[in-house]
Each structure stands twice: as structure tokens, then as C-alpha cells.
Regions:
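Conserved small/polar residues in nucleotide/adenosyl-binding loops
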Residues: 131-133
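Polybasic (Lys/Arg-rich)
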Residues: 43
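Conserved, mostly hydrophobic/aromatic
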Residues: 48
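Phosphate/adenylate-binding glycine loop and adjacent helical scaffold
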Residues: 1-38
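Catalytic phosphate/metal-binding cores of nucleic-acid and nucleotide-processing enzymes, i.e., regions
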Residues: 26-36, 62-65, 72, 78-102, ...
């Protein structure tokens, strides 16, 4: 389970994701949103770093999820997922959003997963571990 934020902008992050990761982001972000919004009370993921980083920021996560769905549809792919409700512009962004080391770690992870595809963006991050945010 993972959300990918190579950039502070949700839209910019969505636009750079490859087909495989963008498709999964819609599903995984929705699953995380269900957990942090107390809709799905599963013990399996509640302490996962990709979940804990979004606690207290369900509106921001809904915005992220909707942005992934929007980009998916913009690319012409079939989408059966519903947009999530959110309180724009009233919500607060998570405090880690915009921290350079966070976005560098995501870029590094994406480069590791698909160097040919993500190399086109000119990212130069070394092989970094993802930073766990809680």
C-alpha cells in the first residue's frame, strides 16, 4: 500500500505517474481514505506508514484520490470509482507536504521501480529509503 507524491502538487504528481502506478493509486488511496475516515475499520492496515501519514488529513487524501481519478479519466481509461467528498478549500494540507526530503524519497522510489519511464523526468535522486511519517 502506497501513495506517491514525487511533487507537492497532487495534479503534478498524478500527471507523471505511469499507467500501472496511476491505476493503483486510485484504489490504494481510496482504501487508505476508508481507513482514516473510519469507514473501514480493518486491523490489517491501520498502523501501516502509508495510512498513518494521512490520519487527520482525510480531506487532503480525498483531494489526492480525486486527482488520481481525474488524471486516469483524462488519459481515456475506463473508471468505475466515485469521487470522494472533500472540503476544498477549507482543509489543511498535511505538514509533511512540500518537504523536499519527502518528495525526493518518492522520486527515488519511483526511479527504482521503473528507471526507464521515470528517467524521462530528469530526476537525480540517489537510492533513498521512503521516510515514514506519522
Amino acid at each position: 500500500m502506497q501513495t506517491f507524491l514525487p511533487y507537492p502538487s497532487f495534479a503534478e504528481s498524478a500527471k507523471c505517474l505511469d499507467y500501472k502506478r496511476l491505476g493503483k493509486q486510485r484504489v490504494e488511496a481510496m482504501q487508505i481514505w476508508n481507513i482514516v475516515s473510519d469507514i473501514q475499520l480493518t486491523k490489517g492496515w491501520i498502523h501501516h506508514p502509508a495510512v498513518t501519514m494521512w490520519y487527520g488529513h482525510s480531506d487532503a487524501l480525498a483531494h489526492y484520490t480525486n486527482t488520481m481519478i481525474h488524471e486516469w479519466k483524462q488519459r481515456g481509461y475506463n473508471n468505475t470509482m466515485k469521487y470522494l467528498p472533500w472540503s476544498y478549500p477549507m482543509y489543511m494540507h498535511p505538514p509533511w507536504l512540500g518537504r523536499p526530503e519527502i518528495h525526493a524519497a518518492y522520486r527515488s522510489n519511483l526511479l527504482r521501480k521503473d528507471p526507464d519511464y521515470y528517467g524521462q523526468f530528469g530526476w537525480t535522486e540517489p537510492d533513498l529509503s521512503l521516510i515514514h511519517i506519522s
